[in-house]
Amino acid sequence: MRYVFDIETNGFLHSCDKVHCIVLKDIDTGEILTPDNETAIKKLEEADLIIGHNIIKFDIPVLEKLYSATFKGKIFDTLVGTRLIFSDIKDKDFSIKDFPKDCIGKHSLKAWGNRIGEYKEQIETDWQTFTPEMLEYCKQDTEVTYKLYKVIEEKGYSPEAMDLEHEVASLIFKQEEHGFTFDTEKAQALSVKLKARLAELSEELQGVFKPIVTERWSTKTGKKLKDSVTIFNPSSRHHVAQRLKEKYGWDAQEFTADGKAKLDDSILSKLPYPEAKILCEHFLLNKRIAQIANGSQAWLKHERNGKIHGTCNTNSCVTSRASHSYPNLGQVPSTSAPFGKECRELFTVPKGKRLVGVDVSSLEVMMLCHYMSKFDNGAYTKVALEGDIHTETQKLAGLDSRDLAKRFYYCFLYGGSVKKIAEVINKPFKEAGKIKKRFLNNLPALHKLIEGVQSAAERGYLTGLDKRQIKVRNSYSALNTLLQSAGAILCKRWLVEFNKEIQKYKNAQQVVWVHDEIQVECEEKDADEIGKIAVECIKRAGEHFNLRVPLTGEYKISTNWSGTH
């Protein structure tokens, strides 16, 4: 049997303790079923295929929690399916007349109901008590899900890609539920320390940028009013830009979407003014304090029982990359960044355990080598493996130093425009254009690859490693899109291979995945072996896709994140 289903509960996953109703639709007969919960669960447990929207992260774990349900059949989550197939849906939504603004780019059932003409009626309820309207609402959700499943099915999408995304979604849900152990006490102490330093800097800046006193006169009586006093606010980008312009004639080179001067710690760090250094530190401290304590995604605000349970959307980008939120663990500063080491030390493991950090070596470079091998029989791969890729780039691009070559190379690899390359290597625009042209002329295999990829991109998509369609917005970003997607798909295969292998280790659990890196909590005695297995699984993932390059990785063992990456 094959069923589409939906449930209504009295709360979210961790708070609900009651399932009000379960509705099933037999997709072979079209029959809608509204049995009692026990009967419905038995049918789902015995089904060959169960289909639902966001069932991996909600419906199934709810039924497992409240009814100890076990499902033997295949699980198909339409949320996972739509995120894979319609990764560029936001662009299309903008072209639909009167499309609800709160649904643009969303993959909710409400949004999909609007797209496929099966509009969801909303009901007023606190979800605490069952009502007949609630059952009708559940039936409606089941119908929307069924029609959405048919839309997905008609696409005839790559089964390999679809299966991979479902496997990754399931293992990442386990990661989220387990959480990353967080040192709350240490985080609070760090926040206090940074706030104290911020107060010192604020006081110093008040002395540098004196209050602006403006005389005021009544327009009615002509009498003098109390002077207006504007106290300098070092956290205000508008105030900072205004004062720098007044004192030094500074003009912004970059602007925000609403036309205001763009100003952050990276821009301030490049200015020659003595106040810029203090302002730069002030901006940076504000950013770190927001990450730790004050911001909407602050770690301390999302800590639960000594752990951070960050959410991961496993396919949020057209390139198949994941995104992170509540809080964003993809933006924890690196150990080389200011206060980065102190921040990473907050993410740790329980006493007696170890953290194993593993990442793929030179991921984007290896993906480039794989695709270039078609045109140069592995010559560039040989340089990457046996020589020094940045020294080679220095020679090919005619740059002055290896450091410049490295900056140019990664900017080029990540899709940087000539303007961006010029900024990164500190060269005039025209010279940067010549350097890029020289690099491509001296590397004909890369030139041919770019031409081939741009030609393929004219149909609107590229074919990924697992036969998925990678949407391309424009030809100049096609190579970067291809390489990013290849890296993302490869890492997803790696996660699946690795998580299968560590099932035999008691208390071993992946706690975070960020791009080409994973962190694994485990017993101290198993740490080294798990690290070796993780690296072996990187190699295995490359072989799975028949890559023309050998892949590897490296691992580190510590008691916190600062020691493993």
Q: Can you say where each PLM-predicted feature lies in the sequence?
A:
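Conserved "right-hand" nucleotidyltransferase catalytic core of DNA-directed polymerases
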Residues: 1-8, 16, 21, 99, ...
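Active-site-proximal helix-loop-helix substrate-binding element of RNase H-like nuclease domains
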Residues: 13, 17-20, 24-35, 48-154, ...
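Metal-dependent catalytic core segments for phosphate chemistry
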Residues: 18-21, 364-397, 466
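Short active-site oxyanion
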Residues: 45-50, 71, 228-231, 352-356
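Short, conserved secondary-structure transition motifs
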Residues: 80-90, 234-235, 554-565
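Conserved catalytic core of nucleic-acid polymerases
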Residues: 227, 309, 314-317, 395-513, ...
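Short, contiguous acidic/charged loop-to-helix segments that flank catalytic cores in large enzymes
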Residues: 295-303, 314, 333-335, 357, ...
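Short amphipathic alpha-helices in soluble, non-transmembrane regions
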Residues: 530-538
